[in-house]
Swiss-Prot record:
Residue positions with a glycan: 29
Leader sequence residues: 1-27
GO MF assignments: ciliary neurotrophic factor receptor binding; cytokine activity; signaling receptor binding
Quaternary context: Forms a heteromeric complex with cardiotrophin-like cytokine CRLF1/CLF-1; the CRLF1-CLCF1 complex is a ligand for the ciliary neurotrophic factor receptor/CNTFR. The CRLF1-CLCF1 heterodimer binds SORL1 (via N-terminal ectodomain); within this complex, the interaction is mediated predominantly by the CRLF1 moiety. The tripartite signaling complex formed by CRLF1, CLCF1 and CNTFR also binds SORL1.
Principal location listed in the UniProt entry: secreted
Source organism superkingdom: Eukaryota
Pfam families associated with the record: PRF
Protein name per its UniProtKB record: Cardiotrophin-like cytokine factor 1
Keywords: Cytokine, Glycoprotein, Secreted, Signal
This protein's GO CC annotations: CNTFR-CLCF1 complex; CRLF-CLCF1 complex; extracellular region; extracellular space
Length: 225
């Protein structure tokens, strides 16, 4: 079939006329409220970054504590560290947590752990260790702010601390040097477990809040130009 230039322009004019008279279709809103997705993704990424950062900090700090704390197979019992928030939870219990409780537990845990880490920073004997701890505390404060942002986006209030309950990593005079090191060891170990759990928490939340993919695409092709 021979389509001449005039015929092509005529067909194009006809197509434009048809499109002009089609009922208006609202455009997809690409600039509106993105919802909680970006905040959740940012928080997830931050937990993974902190996991990486903690590996470096823990290696430095455990070497500072010395043997047996820097030995790979050392796994002492929890003694004075019972006040630390526990990340370990039964799998079925973890799955049954609603979004608000999941976020609240993360926020409260890191609020406590941050106070303990600041206590470690004050007690650190070397300038290099104090710098490493201060940098990690700043990153952990950023994670707290990110969790608060997710909660605000979802309409959840921040948990309010009870008066006079702010934790402090400051044992009494009867605490021996070895037991103090045990507490420090368990603080780092519990923090590692919390970051691992938080990555699972926010990955689960991210998948739950992910919007469905668009299923309709308008595709126009022009030929003959």
């Amino acid at each position: 079939m021979d389509l001449r230039a005039g015929d092509s322009w005529g067909m194009l004019a006809c197509l434009c006329t048809v499109l002009w008279h089609l009922p208006a279709v609202p455009a997809l809103n690409r600039t509106g409220d993105p919802g909680p997705g970006p905040s959740i993704q940012k928080t997830y990424d931050l937990t993974r970054y902190l996991e990486h950062q903690l590996r470096s900090l823990a290696g430095t700090y455990l070497n500072y504590l010395g043997p047996p704390f820097n030995e790979p197979d050392f796994n002492p019992p929890r003694l004075g560290a019972e006040t630390l928030p526990r990340a370990t939870v039964n799998l079925e219990v973890w799955r049954s947590l609603n979004d608000r409780l999941r976020l609240t537990q993360n926020y409260e845990a890191y609020s406590h752990l941050l106070c303990y880490l600041r206590g470690l920073n004050r007690q650190a004997a070397t300038a290099e260790l104090r710098r490493s701890l201060a940098h990690f505390c700043t990153s952990l404060q950023g994670l707290l702010g990110s969790i608060a942002g997710v909660m605000a986006t979802l309409g959840y209030p921040l948990p309010q601390p009870l008066p006079g309950t702010e934790p402090a990593w400051a044992p009494g005079p009867a605490h021996s040097d070895f037991l103090q090191k045990m507490d420090d060891f368990w603080l780092l170990k519990e923090l590692q477990t919390w970051l691992w759990r938080s990555a699972k928490d926010f990955n689960r939340l991210k998948k739950k809040m992910q919007p469905p993919a668009a299923s309709v695409t308008l595709h126009l092709e022009a030929h003959g130009f």
